[in-house]
């Protein structure tokens, strides 16, 4: 039995979000051996237990208070929320933050030779999906009547098998759709991974641990989105150079040995530094321009 004094986090055992969830926890300094095929893994350096489960089980585990936190795709979370509301339940949870991975879109797709002019083209159509409530929510708003064909996998083969006229499924590149004679016609939901917390009172020690974890996650995400920039620049062009780096804090200016009119600049930029920007920096007299990744960051 799990020790209820330890923080319990549910994450996908395998699949699209599993590797990135593991990487996030590792970069937050949580030491967990996730190589073995265990349903429960224990952190070595923090009172944290990881439950490795199917992704569609995670929202329910959080909403039912079985675990304290869950890392889950917003599409799966929203489908579970709509399902429970349809059953007359009042599910409760908190979204702590959206994460910077797991991006996908839930889309409608029809056969390549179909005439699609908008959602109304699907009036009275039979649509195969693993997300019946998200599909219904979207088409109800469009005033479209339809019949749902619930499939838990291989949704894209439904039209060829004669099970459906169209599908509603997750799309990344669209290659799978094309291979099955389908084309994406409408995006109905865009999703990323998110971190959610159960409703209800949380023991103080657990809440403090959650706060520490959130600070680390924020630092990891900021580090991914930021770059450390070092360059040499003419003293009289500093303001122009800083203006080219939106999102950058005021730079650290250091004297450059043997050069009275040039300085070394160090700064953190939260913006991607494109080649065009570097060329503009060089045109302003900057040299020795280095753009480095940041592993950890805390403000």
Swiss-Prot record:
Give the signal peptide range. Answer: none
Pathway this chain belongs to: Amino-acid biosynthesis; L-histidine biosynthesis; L-histidine from 5-phospho-alpha-D-ribose 1-diphosphate: step 1/9
| Catalytic activity, as annotated | 1-(5-phospho-beta-D-ribosyl)-ATP + diphosphate = 5-phospho-alpha-D-ribose 1-diphosphate + ATP
Biological process according to GO: L-histidine biosynthetic process
Sum up the protein's function in the record's words: Catalyzes the condensation of ATP and 5-phosphoribose 1-diphosphate to form N'-(5'-phosphoribosyl)-ATP (PR-ATP). Has a crucial role in the pathway because the rate of histidine biosynthesis seems to be controlled primarily by regulation of HisG enzymatic activity.
Extract the NCBIfam families matched here: hisG (TIGR00070), HisG_C-term (TIGR03455)
Q: Name one GO molecular function term.
A: ATP binding
Keywords assigned by UniProt, alphabetized: Amino-acid biosynthesis, ATP-binding, Cytoplasm, Glycosyltransferase, Histidine biosynthesis, Magnesium, Metal-binding, Nucleotide-binding, Transferase
Answer yes or no on keyword Glycosyltransferase: yes
The disulfide bridges present are: none
Q: How does it assemble?
A: Equilibrium between an active dimeric form, an inactive hexameric form and higher aggregates. Interconversion between the various forms is largely reversible and is influenced by the natural substrates and inhibitors of the enzyme.
By sequence similarity, the record places it as follows: Belongs to the ATP phosphoribosyltransferase family. Long subfamily.
Nucleotide-binding found in the keyword field: yes
Cofactor names from the entry are: Mg(2+)
Activity control, as annotated, is:
Feedback inhibited by histidine.
User: Under what name is this protein listed?
Assistant: ATP phosphoribosyltransferase
GO CC annotations, alphabetized: cytoplasm
Q: Which gene encodes it?
A: hisG
Localization, UniProt: Cytoplasm
What EC number is given for this enzyme?
2.4.2.17
């Amino acid at each position: 039995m799990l020790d209820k004094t330890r923080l319990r986090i549910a994450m996908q055992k395998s699949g699209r979000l599993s590797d990135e969830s593991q990487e996030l926890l590792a970069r937050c300094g949580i030491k967990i051996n996730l190589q073995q095929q265990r349903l429960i893994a224990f952190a070595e350096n923090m009172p944290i237990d990881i439950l490795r489960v199917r992704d569609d089980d995670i929202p329910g585990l959080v909403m039912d208070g079985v675990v304290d936190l869950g890392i889950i795709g917003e599409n799966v979370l929203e489908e579970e929320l709509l399902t429970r509301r349809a059953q007359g339940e009042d599910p409760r949870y908190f979204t702590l933050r959206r994460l910077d991975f797991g991006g996908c879109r839930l889309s409608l797709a029809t056969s390549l030779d179909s005439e699609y002019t908008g959602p109304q083209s699907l009036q009275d159509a039979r649509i195969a999906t693993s997300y019946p409530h998200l599909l219904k929510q979207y088409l109800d708003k469009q005033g479209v009547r339809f019949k749902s064909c619930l499939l838990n996998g291989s949704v894209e083969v439904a039209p060829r098998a004669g099970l459906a006229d169209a599908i509603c499924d997750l799309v990344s590149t669209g290659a799978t759709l094309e291979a099955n004679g389908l084309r994406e016609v409408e995006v109905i939901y865009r999703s990323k991974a998110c971190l959610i917390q159960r409703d209800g009172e949380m023991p103080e020690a657990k809440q403090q641990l959650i706060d520490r974890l959130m600070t680390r996650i924020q630092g990891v995400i900021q580090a991914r989105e930021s770059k450390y920039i070092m360059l040499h620049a003419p003293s009289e062009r500093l303001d122009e150079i800083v203006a080219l780096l939106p999102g950058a804090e005021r730079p650290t200016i250091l004297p450059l040995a043997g050069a009275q009119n040039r300085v070394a600049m160090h700064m953190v930029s939260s913006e991607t530094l494109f080649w065009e920007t570097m060329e503009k920096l060089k045109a302003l007299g900057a040299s020795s321009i280095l753009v480095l990744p940041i592993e950890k960051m805390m403000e």
